[in-house]
């Protein structure tokens, strides 16, 4: 499913559903504004009222200064002691750090996604204590994979001694509701509603993306006449300016997807065009921060957080009195901060059809330069929609492919990917060590 999601006016934010999208494409819609096309497959978006602990929820990206110790506190819904897909983190859990003699050294808390961390001196021995709320219980510990299981004693919440000789990001704690737990009461008026969006009008770019996500189904809020005849649709929502656009009910999204699937059962498709691995590629340049500038009142940023091994997203408020002041960007469905394992800057040729209508070329057979940000580093790569051996053999298209300069597959980190599309003459600049500026350059004739 492809859904056109608004970013302007600023009342569209925070959007609902972006954290569930394997790929999000961001691009200019002229006049200094941008829009997103979110892909949904493999998992439907769902609203959530998150569990929280008794402590303050930590905010901001974790900044490493020494050797790291940390990871995540999560809700172990099935009580199997392992972090399974769909089991989310718990914010506001206090975590205490002790030295070898049992003296309390530091205290921190988990953030909205359940992550915590400490900067520590290498070669020392420490232990942790997770402080659970009264209505939650610890799951069994050491039930399997060290990166996925719980390490907290089910009675005390404490860990065994930990010797720090390198970054150690595998000390987790699983919690589940005990007999005294009462589910949070949904806030009917202000709580998350089962909707995605806001949904706005279609753009010419969507025809190209729909083409390489074969059997996909595009939903938008109509489009200008010259665009409407060129892009495929399987459904529309009403066009509304208030609140940044109309919201799409998740039940309707599911019904449209199921109807589309019934019509496509005889048509094969394959979305595995890229390579993913936890192993960090060599040769990248440090990139802890990405600053994105479309216009003075349209700025955003990405901060690398080593606890997540992903980039946390930040946005402005389009406030002329406070331009460029960023805050955490969250998903309206969950209240959790958006984080993406891969941020890719794609440089694509752009034609100006009219001052407010761009044709951004991701056509079949195209390609160009790109920049991959993953694991706190930047790697120059290329993008391609050209047919490879698979496409030539089967006649089927696959999604946009990311390649190293020698033509081998660029390796992405498993997880979600944010694709920022800019013109070939946009600025990609190192502002200071580890900090990149992506400044959009409008083609001649684009309304600013």
Where are these regions (language model features)?
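Short, acidic Ser/Thr/Gly-rich low-complexity loop/linker segments typical of extracellular
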Residues: 75-84, 89-91, 99-115
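Surface-exposed loops/turns
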Residues: 112, 122-123
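Beta-strand signatures of extracellular beta-sandwich domains
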Residues: 72, 94-98, 127-129
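A surface/extracellular/periplasmic glyco- and lipid-processing/surface-interacting theme
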Residues: 1-25, 29-65, 178-448
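Short beta-strand/loop motifs in extracellular/secreted proteins, especially
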Residues: 91-95, 124-126, 368
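A short, solvent-exposed beta-strand micro-motif common in secreted/extracellular proteins
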Residues: 124-135
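A short, Gly/Thr-enriched small/hydrophobic beta-strand-prone motif that recurs across taxa
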Residues: 64-82, 94, 171-172
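Short strand-edge motifs at loop-to-beta-strand transitions and within beta-strands
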Residues: 114-118, 158-160, 169-171
């Amino acid at each position: 499913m492809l859904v056109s999601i608004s970013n302007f006016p600023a009342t569209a934010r925070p959007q609902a559903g972006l954290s569930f999208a394997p790929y999000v494409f961001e691009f200019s819609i002229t006049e200094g504004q941008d829009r997103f096309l979110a892909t949904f497959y493999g998992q439907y978006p769902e609203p959530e009222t998150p569990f929280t602990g008794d402590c303050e929820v930590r905010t901001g990206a974790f900044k490493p200064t020494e050797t790291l110790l940390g990871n995540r506190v999560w809700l172990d819904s099935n009580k199997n002691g392992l972090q399974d897909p769909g089991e989310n983190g718990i914010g506001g859990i206090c975590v205490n750090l002790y030295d070898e003699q049992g003296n309390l050294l530091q205290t921190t808390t988990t953030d909205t996604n359940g992550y915590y961390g400490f900067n520590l001196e290498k070669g020392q021995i420490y232990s942790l204590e997770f402080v659970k709320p009264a209505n939650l219980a610890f799951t069994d510990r050491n039930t399997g994979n060290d990166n996925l299981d719980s390490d907290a004693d089910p009675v005390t919440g404490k860990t065994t001694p930990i010797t720090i000789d390198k970054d150690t990001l595998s000390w987790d704690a699983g919690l589940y509701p005990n007999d005294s737990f009462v589910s949070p009461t949904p806030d009917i008026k202000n709580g998350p509603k089962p909707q995605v969006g806001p949904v706005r009008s279609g753009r010419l770019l969507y025809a190209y993306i729909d083409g390489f996500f074969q059997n996909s189904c595009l939903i938008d809020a109509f489009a200008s006449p010259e665009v409407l005849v060129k892009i495929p649709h399987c459904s529309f929502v009403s066009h509304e300016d208030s609140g940044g656009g109309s919201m799409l009910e998740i039940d309707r999204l599911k019904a449209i997807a199921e109807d589309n699937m019934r019509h496509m059962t005889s048509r094969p498709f394959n979305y595995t065009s890229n390579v993913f691995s936890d192993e960090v590629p060599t040769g990248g340049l440090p990139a802890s921060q990405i600053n994105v500038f479309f216009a003075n009142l349209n700025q955003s940023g990405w901060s690398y957080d080593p606890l997540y091994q992903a980039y946390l997203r930040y946005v402005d408020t389009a406030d002329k009195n406070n331009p460029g002041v960023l805050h955490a960007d969250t998903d309206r469905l969950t209240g959790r901060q958006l984080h993406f394992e891969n941020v890719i800057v794609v440089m694509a040729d752009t034609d100006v059809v009219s001052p407010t209508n761009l044709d951004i070329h991701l056509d079949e057979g195209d390609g160009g330069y790109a920049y991959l940000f993953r694991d706190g580093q930047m790697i120059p790569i290329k993008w391609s929609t050209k047919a490879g051996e698979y496409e030539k053999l089967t006649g089927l298209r696959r999604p946009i492919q990311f390649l190293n300069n020698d033509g081998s597959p660029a390796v992405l980190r498993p997880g979600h990917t944010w694709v920022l599309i800019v013109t070939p003459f946009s600025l990609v600049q190192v502002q200071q060590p580890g900090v990149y500026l992506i400044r959009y350059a409008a083609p001649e004739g684009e309304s600013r």
